[in-house]
Amino acid sequence: MTKDLGSSSVFVRIAWAGLAAGGLAALASCSHAHEPVGDRSGPPPGTTARATAESAPPSSAVSSASRASSASSLGPPAPAPRCDAPHEPFFFVSPAHPVAGRPLRVLAVTDDAVDATLSFARASTPASAAGGDQEPVVQTRDRRGGPPYAWLADVDAAAAGKWRLQLTKSDACGGGSLGAHDVTVYTWAAPVPDAPRAVLWRTRQLWSPALENLYSAWIGHLFDAPADAQPSWDTLADVLRDRDRNWLFDYLGAKEDEEGVAIKPDCADLPYFLRAYFAFKLGLPFGFSHCSRGENGAPPHCADFASNEDPFPPVDDKPQAVPSWADPDRPPGGPWDDSMKRFGEFLRTTLADAAQSGAGRTPAADEDGDYYPLRLSADTLRPGAIFADPYGHVLVVAGRLAQTPSSAGVLFAVDGQPDGTVGRKRFWRGNFLFAIDPALGSAGFKRFRPVVRDPKTAKLREAPNALIRDLSVTDQYEGGVEGFYDKVEDVLSPSPL
């Protein structure tokens, strides 16, 4: 895993130093009015620059990258590229332990819409602000998404040794490195660690703005498709097993995504399953609460927070029975010593049972919920955010197209259905229902509350409101229903057509 290079995104910022419904709500259904469903297989995402390290000339990689830009719906945004780049890029390599002769994927992610090229070349000196000294074997100028913006390239088979990832400004912007990162390609495969006995997975690092950016970019690429497409998949597992879409495919080096684990979330499960999968792969904290749906005129409420380190806390002050797959005293050598099988069973049972749509409708000022309400802006309506409607449906923001002189901006979101299908939809009132009713709770656009480590107890907990910069308990609600829709449209299309 690469280091956090300190993106200053306003998306999520933890200020804690040292923390490295009534009857309608009760209906709570994932079935929802939507646009006609297209091809269930989903069109292929935008292709990436690809080369075999030390076998393909740089020119072929550039050609492949240039073709990619026309295929991706979330390609270069409409606004002219900026040459200023105040944020350092975050670099990422998949798998976590690259092995000679095997494919790897390289990325750079930043908040800046800068015109730049990502290159992967042999390195003879440590990464620095100075340029690389060898010709790249793969490079791409294809800037995707925004914000955050990502450059992505595939290497079919890298040779063992030291390599350098570098993001460089275009000649039109004066050239010069925006940042670099050294990558080691090994001659040997890393041993697969044993599944932990007591925790779901070990926490190896904490969430940061750069990792939140990476999460957003991952979601955007996972569900990418041409703008006029309406892709649908039979299950989320079909998406995650698509190597081109999922850059975390077999990230742990254990062929974990080839085990055929069933992953079939409904709408309320989908954001939790995506967040848990990303956290499981990267060793990040993950948490979830046990929430009510709201009843007798009272909105939903959440309590009894659980995490990857403490997945079975008491609920309603009563101890939970620990299932056999999570029993720390289980006999060794059984199927639950396989980390991916345990993770899949956690999704299918514990998390699916706990996750429900009431979690997305807790009151805006409530600090006990898994989500917090966003201040609406072009920076916050990014992949990974969720939309919870007042009546029990939940969608995950999957991408956004910027406004052009001739067309309005577009917001894409994906949702799950009770039969496990996942489809992509555009923002419009028929898909994104909104109401303001205290008995139903607070609907609208929200984001996962960051899970942090309490400096006093060393336990994982959810961050309070005061530590989240892009939170607003009033922004989506103060203008009423019409004001909400007007504000979203203003974010998507800030200029008159």
Located regions from the model:
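Structural beta-strand segments of beta-rich domains
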Residues: 102-106
